[in-house]
Design a protein with these regions (language model features):
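Phosphodiester-processing cores and adjacent nucleic acid-binding clamps
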Residues: 1-128
């Protein structure tokens, strides 16, 4: 079985708490060098680099899967900064659209220091 790093961040992951200054193309080049066939992008609370990542992956002939690292809280309407991290990787275009909506709601309605996801919304997602 091939190893693929599905949890990583790039230079656009989080403006407030940057994890890295590595750019998408550097990751993709290295993935190709290692013989990987898939590149995952999972930035903090956003899908900020999805178009750049897809373009670069196409250039290098590697599959691109988009995900997010989300912040789960029991009730995002409460002003409590505690949260649990979760990686969400949709496997279909339909699922990707649903994750985008989930993430939009987290940013619009659940934002308190970070875009927080409603547990109910997460549980309502299809298994795809």
């Amino acid at each position: 079985m091939e190893y693929c790093n599905y949890h990583k961040h790039d230079h656009v992951s989080s403006i407030t708490t940057p994890d890295t200054n590595i750019r998408c193309e550097e990751y993709v080049k290295r993935a190709v060098e290692l013989g990987h066939t898939t590149y995952f992008t999972t930035n903090h609370g956003n899908g900020g680099d999805i178009f750049e990542a897809k373009t670069i992956c196409d250039k290098y002939g590697i599959r691109c899967l988009f995900g997010i690292e989300g912040y789960i809280v029991p009730n995002p309407l409460e002003k409590d900064s505690r949260n649990y991290h979760i990686i969400i990787i949709p496997t279909t275009n339909k699922a990707r659209r649903k994750v985008n909506l989930l993430n939009s709601r987290a940013n619009e309605e659940g934002f308190y220091y970070k875009p927080r996801i409603f547990v109910e919304d997460l549980l309502a997602l299809d298994k795809d």
